[in-house]
Structure formats: structure tokens, C-alpha cells
Design a protein with these regions (language model features):
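Beta-strand/loop substructures that line and gate deep hydrophobic ligand-binding cavities in soluble
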Residues: 86-137
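Generic structural detector for well-ordered beta-strands
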Residues: 9-13, 40, 58, 72, ...
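A short, structured loop/turn motif at beta-sheet edges
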Residues: 16, 74-81, 99-108
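Beta-strand elements of well-folded, non-transmembrane domains
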Residues: 12-14, 61-63, 75, 90, ...
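Glycine-rich portal/gate segments that line the openings of hydrophobic small-molecule binding cavities
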Residues: 40-88, 141-144, 148-155
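Hydrophobic ligand-binding cavity/cleft-lining segments
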Residues: 1-46, 50
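Short, surface-exposed coil-to-beta transition loops
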Residues: 5-7, 66-70, 92-96
Length: 156
């Protein structure tokens, strides 16, 4: 079965420190996740993210069926990137890289997600119709929410 990938970029007129502080705090995930996902963090979270950190959530990704999701923060390079990997949850495979880099008048965020649906060939068949479509919706929501929070990016 194939591992699929999705890449999304967004530019924000904030400093690298401001963007890092926002994206590296798991507490902000709920704010940039659509309400219909029923996203709830179960884990008590420290102020700072660290490699090896385990975060447990409840989500409702499809058909209003609540699921547990557990991710591990596997890599952290402050003000540059972090990686979360699913340890248990709705995907057979989930690897999400969050990169940020300084650009003129702000920061460019790059998300790279590699994922695979469960259920073998059935999961593979529904991936483009349901899974990829749902991920696109979630990232579109996040894109618009970040504009709402921090404004439209302006180069000059």
C-alpha cells in the first residue's frame, strides 16, 4: 500500500520567535482545528515541546465516531522544525513535519505530511476520495484561521 504525501505552505508577517511559540505549543492545536473534528487534548502539557513528548487526543475524524489519537514529538530544532508521528490512532502511518524559515517581512511555514489509511486495499481506495479530501479541508481551515489570527501576508 502506498504512503501518500501532502505539502502546504503559508507566509505570515510575524517574527520567527512568534511563529515558533505559536506552532510549537500543542495547546494552540485546538484553535486551528475545525470544530467538527471534536479535537480535545487529553494529556497535561508542559509549556515547552520536547523530543520524546507523548500527546494524547480525542478526535472525531469521520462519521462522528470519536477516536483516540496518540502522537510523539520525535524531533525538535527550535525555531526551525519539529516532527510529530502517530503512535496510535486513525492512520496506519502518520509523519508530520512542521518547518519554518525566515523570509522577507515574516516567516514561511511548510508542512509535509506522509500518511497511509488503515484497512489495506479498502483504505487505499478511499484515500483520494475521503482521507486526502479531509486533510485538504483541515489545512484549508488552518490556513484561513491563521490569516484571521495574524492577518494576510504582505511582502512590502
Amino acid at each position: 500500500m502506498a504512503i501518500h504525501s501532502l505539502q502546504k505552505t503559508q507566509k505570515i508577517n510575524l517574527s520567527i520567535s512568534e511563529v515558533w511559540d505559536f506552532i510549537s505549543s500543542p495547546k494552540n492545536l485546538k484553535e486551528i482545528t475545525p470544530d467538527y473534528m471534536g479535537f480535545e487534548i487529553i494529556t497535561d502539557l508542559p509549556e515547552k515541546m520536547y523530543a520524546g513528548q507523548i500527546i494524547q487526543y480525542k478526535v472525531t475524524p469521520l462519521l462522528n465516531i470519536p477516536m483516540s489519537w496518540c502522537t510523539e514529538i520525535t524531533h525538535v530544532k527550535e525555531h526551525e522544525y519539529f516532527v510529530d508521528e502517530q503512535r496510535q490512532g486513525p492512520y496506519k502511518f502518520w509523519h508530520h513535519q512542521h518547518h519554518i524559515k525566515p523570509i522577507k517581512n515574516g516567516v514561511e511555514m511548510l508542512d509535509i505530511v506522509h500518511y497511509q489509511a488503515p484497512f489495506g486495499i479498502i483504505g487505499e481506495l478511499v484515500t483520494p476520495l475521503i482521507v486526502t479530501k479531509k486533510l485538504e479541508e483541515i489545512f484549508e481551515y488552518r490556513f484561513n484561521k491563521l490569516i484571521q489570527l495574524f492577518g494576510e501576508y504582505k511582502e512590502g
